């Protein structure tokens, strides 16, 4: 079975062959690539949740009069999703600073667009530490 024709069936067949030790005919290069893709997917999900978290914390900080239950839920949900990802993938803890640094500009741009506030309102560099981002008690 070719992975391009029916990925699901290819994956199930490959997994079964691996379990039984039948390596003949397995596309080991493709299997390795798929495993790497799964790892990248987890890292991408973490980056996405961090961007959402930073965006809403910026709005929370710089538009206090507009704070809402919706914003609070977005912040709480992002933190919960991040905590779950880090619990399931502890090695991603070592990538947090890199991801925050890389994704903050997108969060900042989103805050500028969503709030309509001048760009100078929002710091160029992330104003939140990793500890603050992950702390369920931190709000401003």
Walk through the language-model features, giving the residues of each.
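Surface/interface-facing alpha-helical segments and adjacent flexible terminal/loop regions used
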Residues: 1-140
